[in-house]
Design a protein with these regions (language model features):
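The conserved Walker
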Residues: 10
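Hydrophobic positions on the alpha1 helix immediately C-terminal to the Walker A/P-loop
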Residues: 17
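Hydrophobic anchor at the beta1->P-loop junction of P-loop NTPases
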Residues: 6
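Conserved nucleotide-sensing/catalytic segment adjacent to the nucleotide-binding pocket
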Residues: 38-81
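Domain-level recognition of nuclease-like catalytic cores that cleave nucleotide substrates
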Residues: 376-399
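Interdomain motor-coupling "hinge/lid" segment immediately C-terminal to the ATP-binding subdomain
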Residues: 91-205
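Conserved lysine of the Walker
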Residues: 14
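Accessory nucleic acid-recognition modules appended to NTPase machines
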Residues: 156, 160-334
Length: 399
């Protein structure tokens, strides 16, 4: 490929990662005049040693086509790195970049990346068909602290109170200015605040546009579902929201798949910040902590699976069977399924769900048997059940 595009939420480490690989760079967010130069004379900002980083390229979206033509003219690999904290609205004149520009999604750090997880059990190891054994050092309260802090690289060396303040400031910036700057459409900050709070309350759930509209409507008034949809699209554009799509798979039974996505903010720390939930409050509310823990696990699974080009989905059918995470590796034609349980009391229920999915629902003649089945927990010990289902604490999960 002639270029790589690094996308992800503000503060997840895109620029630092790109600078580590770039031979030269230009940062469009440093000066309005630099943006103007990029729009008027894009070839000028492409000059420099390669790979050449163009940081926050979306501030001058018209350079996309110019960059594509430059790649065609040079006929060389690894010429440019683009990084951006929002995705400009596509227009008919902008080429997709297919065949020329590879896309890389970055996210806040998984626990193994921040050093909170030992990483002693990898996803690959789970698929080897052998029993697992490990011990997590993370207590129930430690997990609550990790969820509230979030996985932002800039928070590694600061205390939890400061990390919470960062997450609150992050949310405030989204409410007040980030959406308008990225999307170019005026919005109501209070409406965005209510929407993100609603998403935070419904984190890891399949909340509908109608239910969110009802939840965020001020007293005595209403909000149209299409308005909610527009705001959700905008939040997706700035990567503050990352929906978890439903798995589309061939079934052997008469069950019908549900197709609604689950809602997740970019990091569980943002959900806690939006609702003013600190470590003590989260730890004392097991029900909501379970939702936040699931979101933290999904964040980590997305990161870990992406190392092998895997993608994460969820499963639900019309009989009520749900599985929290399906990892699909399209290049290897493999899949795996994970349930998420904060405590140990529902591990048996999770095991039954996983076995029912693998043995009764999925047409294994078409998609194959699962590489592994696992229950990701907030407990202490990793082990393998007689059924072959693994029980794996998040505090030992790694690459």
């Amino acid at each position: 490929m002639g270029a790589v595009l690094i996308e992800g939420p503000r503060g997840c480490g895109k620029t630092s990662t790109a600078l580590a690989k770039a031979a030269s760079h230009v940062r469009l967010d440093k000066s309005p005049s630099m943006v103007q130069l990029a729009e008027l004379n894009p070839s000028e900002i492409m000059k420099g040693d390669t790979p050449r980083l163009i940081d926050e390229w979306q501030l001058a979206p018209s350079i996309w086509n110019a960059l594509r033509h430059e790649i065609d003219d040079r006929q060389q690999r690894g010429q440019f790195i683009l990084s951006g904290s929002s995705s400009p609205t596509m227009d008919k004149s902008r080429h997709s970049g297919a065949g020329r520009i590879a896309r890389l999604r970055m996210r806040p750090m998984a626990l193994v990346e921040s050093g909170a997880s030992s990483g002693s059990i990898s996803l690959n190891q789970l698929g080897m068909g052998e029993s697992v054994s490990a011990t997590s050092e993370l207590s129930y309260r430690d997990l609550a602290e990790q969820a509230v802090r979030g996985g932002w690289p800039g928070l590694l060396e600061i205390g939890t109170r400061q990390a919470i303040a960062f997450n609150r400031s992050y949310c405030e910036n989204i409410y007040e200015s980030e959406l308008e700057a990225a999307v170019g459409v005026r919005h109501n900050p209070d409406a965005v605040r209510r929407l993100i709070s609603s998403v935070a309350r419904n984190i890891s759930s399949e909340a509908t546009l109608q239910s969110i509209a009802k939840d965020i409507a001020p007293a005595g008034s209403s909000v149209e579902p299409k308005t909610v949809a527009a705001y959700i699209d905008a939040l997706n554009q700035v990567f503050a929201l990352e929906e978890l799509p439903a798995w589309s798979v061939s079934l052997r039974s008469r069950s019908r798949l549900r197709t609604s996505s689950k809602l997740h903010l970019a990091d569980p720390g943002l959900a806690c910040a939006a609702l003013g939930v600190g470590v003590d409050r989260l730890a004392s509310d097991p029900e909501y902590f379970g939702q936040v823990f699931e979101s933290m696990v999904i964040r980590d699974l997305r990161t870990l699976a992406s190392a092998e080009f895997g993608r994460v989905y969820h499963y639900r059918d019309n009989t009520g069977l749900e599985v929290d995470a399906i990892i699909e590796y399209p290049e290897d034609s493999k899949w795996a399924a994970c349930e998420v349980k904060l405590g140990s009391s529902r591990i048996h229920e999770a095991e039954e769900n996983l076995l029912k999915l693998a043995n009764d629902r999925v047409d294994v003649e078409k998609v194959g048997k699962p590489a592994f089945l696992a229950v990701i927990t907030g407990t202490e010990y990793a082990y393998t059940l007689p059924s072959g289902v693994h029980v794996v604490p998040l505090g030992v999960l790694g690459y």
